[in-house]
Amino acid sequence: MNIYLLRHGTTDYNTQHRYQGQRDIPLSTAGRQALCRADFDPDVVFVSPMTRARQTAHILFPDAEQVVVPGLREMDFGTFEGRNYVEMENDPDYRAWVASNCESACPDGERKDDFCDRSCAVFAKLVDDALAAGRRQLVILAHGGTQMSVMERFALPRKEYHDWLGPNAGGYLLETDPETWAKDHTMRCLAKVQYTKDAMAKREAGC
C-alpha cells in the first residue's frame, strides 16, 4: 500500500517563523496561489481539523472526500503560539524549553513525547484500517509535526525527528504491506513530493 503523508500549504505564520500549533491559522494568499492540483486523485483524504490542512486538501484533491481526524492536529505549543523565537529570546520559559532540547512541556501546552505518541497512535490506526480494508492507497494531510513524529518512528531509512520536516504542501510517499506492518510497523520512504505549481513545473521539466 502506498501512503502519502503530507503537510499543509504556507501560512503567514510559516513565513514569519511563528509557532502556530493549534491556532486555526488559514493559508496565506501566496500559500493558496502556490498550490496546484495533485497528479493523482484519491477518493478520500484523512485531514487534520485545522483550516490550513483542509484548505490545502481541497486544492490538491478537489474531488476527494475529507475525513477529519481530530488526533491529527498539530502539537499544542501553549503560550509560545503566535510568537517567534526572536520575540521570545528573553522569555525564561522559552529559554528553558529550548535548553531541554524542546523536550519539556510547553507552558499550557503539550510535551513533545506526548504529541508524538498521539500522532503515531492515530497514524497507526489509519494504516491498520486501510490495510484491513485492502486499500492500495492512504492519503493523510496534516502538519510538519505530524510528519516528523510519524517518520521518525515508522519510516525507513531511519533519521532523526527534525530531519523529516517536509516542505509546505508536500511530504513523503511511503510504502508498506500487511506482512511488514504486522511484523515491525515500518514503511519504506520512496520519494519526497510537493504539490506547488513551481515544484510540479520542475518535475515536468525533468529537473
Residue ranges and their predicted role:
Residues 3, 43, 134-144:
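Generic beta-sheet signal
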Residues 144-148, 177:
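GST superfamily/GST-like fold recognition
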Residues 60-120:
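Phosphate-handling substructures
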Residues 52-53, 122, 146-147:
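Alpha-helix capping/helix-boundary segments
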Residues 40-71, 96, 152, 175-207:
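Conserved histidine-centered catalytic loops in small-molecule metabolism enzymes
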Residues 157-185:
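Domain-level recognition of soluble alpha/beta enzyme cores
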Residues 2-64:
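Active-site-proximal alpha-helix that buttresses catalytic centers in soluble enzyme cores
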Residues 47-48, 117, 141-142:
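Short beta-strand scaffold positions
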